[in-house]
């Protein structure tokens, strides 16, 4: 049998070193055919990646079934005789070793071969004996490299297997090792590279190392590392914070030093500017007084320890960057200009203050110095009159004048606005007389605050009308009173004893009004106008006290007709007193009260006529334009106080003008004076049997009734009670007043009034149950009837 070229593939198996493979080129063609035969019956897709051999380890990414196919294909390279042609040769080969015959049986079952391909292979393989010999003599199978070319998209695969074992047992061991390795590789994804296989091996080694280490040791190591990192970060943050604090402290200190230097420079410049102004104006005293304050402040600032430390630590010659350009708006320039502004000393204001202080001292001296003359004149005049003022009244007037300066200061400094209002009301309610300049300059004492309050008051139109009316009345009153006083001095002929001037009376009246009004204002009332009404009523009553000393030089015997006219005047006055508070609160009664007030205000201009027709003429004359003017004024409290102030003074002055020559012995006068001083107010209220005492008590009770109904009118008007409840008149006093009341046209009452009036020579006009004239008693009865009717109407 000749050898065919196909036997070259068998030579590859026979060579152990693999040197013949490179020499024989036909072996590659046979292997390509066998791989093509394999592709024909293989149903699995080959991977496109190359596989290489690793020493002692077979690394494959294909599953176990694919590795078995490659193994079986490698085993097919061994001679597989056909059933028909090579039966004898197979029997000979299997007889040599039965164990080796198992391998081809396994391959036949696993891999069936097509008939056409097997026939071509059988034809090429002619020499089978040589194969048997090689199987007998060779213990190792050389590695067969199968090169299989896939499709166009697949890459060439290089599969290398190393099979050891001359027997079937060795082949079985090799197969088991390959399957175990394939199972380990199957755990990895099929598309991993050779590096992944190395990583798997390393992981196994790490697991072995971890099993050996203890967990406590690992925790200690981790804690140490973390602590070191935290400490390093903390030190880094501390260093940053220290650096920031140092920079900020430097900046703050420099800024504080700059501000301190600025303040010090400003203080020095202010001192220089003030010194220059003082030398320029000539007023060194004011400059030094102003200069002491900033120096004290600068010293206090520089004595601070922190300021000293800053001043010492920084250089003194540090420039201050300030742009002194007044044309351009700059915050630094404005700040410096504001601190450097120095007010000029006002010479005019200081001069005015000095003159006003001198006027104050003069007026206080005037108010206090004539007091002795006033008391002396009272004592001399009492020798010629039957009735007199009680002794405690004189002491009261004296005490009020002495305490004037203190009350004036308290009213000016404690409540400037309230004092301004009260002072203005008290001045306006007085009858103006001989020294108008000194009286009119006084409201300007409280640093201009009174001027503001007066401006606010003048803005009221009703107040303007009332003020204009009051000025006309006071001007005429002053002239009439001056005339009556001059005539009185001529009649009396005693210049030293009866030296009672109008300024003295105005000053005393001003004292009473100030002393009574300021407590009312300081008591915390809500309405200033209401307080002005009450204070003006009190001032009216106290005016009658002060003026009661003047008409004591009256004549004892007067004619009946003159008494009637005087009685009519005083009735009108007291009717206004009783109804004045009603006009403030009740708007329905304004018309009636307006008529009464017109009658009162008109009495200043009318001459005193001793005929009973004078009342009718006055009523007709006054019902004209004056009533309209007062009704237009809306009857403010100021008009009430103004209209109340003048009638009492006018009545007293008119009585003084009509005085006859008084002819009465001093002894009889002193006896009656002593009797009336010892009499108590309770005895004055009670009724007596003697006609003279009864008439005198009627006069006193009449005055008490007018005062009581004045208070009752205040209560009914809904305003605040100026007197407490225990000082108001009792029911018994009111009942006694009602017994004496009768119609105005009653002839009995007129006769009784004439008899009592013959013995009356003065108008004391004292409140709180003191002696009064019967004229006021009749006015009180009319006021009582009017108030009763109004109550029933309500």
From Swiss-Prot:
It is found in: Nucleus; Cytoplasm, Cytoskeleton. Residues 487-500, 539-555, 585-607 have a biased composition (Basic and acidic residues). A motif (Nuclear localization signal) lies at residues 657-664. It comes from the Eukaryota. One of its GO terms (cellular component) is chloroplast envelope. The modification Phosphoserine is found at residues 78, 80, 142, 193, 195, 369, 459, 502, 544. Residues 15-101, 277-296, 375-417, 472-555, 578-794 are annotated as: Disordered. SMART domains: IQ. Residues 214-242, 243-265 form the IQ domain. Residues 23-33, 56-65, 80-95, 473-486, 768-786 have a biased composition (Polar residues). Coiled coil: none annotated. InterPro entries: DUF4005, IQ_motif_EF-hand-BS. Keywords: Calmodulin-binding, Cytoplasm, Cytoskeleton, Nucleus, Phosphoprotein, Repeat. Residues 643-654 have a biased composition (Low complexity). It holds the Pfam family DUF4005. GO terms for molecular function: calmodulin binding. Residues 230-241 are annotated as: Calmodulin-binding. May be involved in cooperative interactions with calmodulins or calmodulin-like proteins. Recruits calmodulin proteins to microtubules, thus being a potential scaffold in cellular signaling and trafficking. May associate with nucleic acids and regulate gene expression at the transcriptional or post-transcriptional level. Belongs to the IQD family. Binds to multiple calmodulin (CaM) in the presence of Ca(2+) and CaM-like proteins. This is Protein IQ-DOMAIN 32. It comes from Arabidopsis thaliana (Mouse-ear cress). The lineage of its organism: Eukaryota, Viridiplantae, Streptophyta, Embryophyta, Tracheophyta.
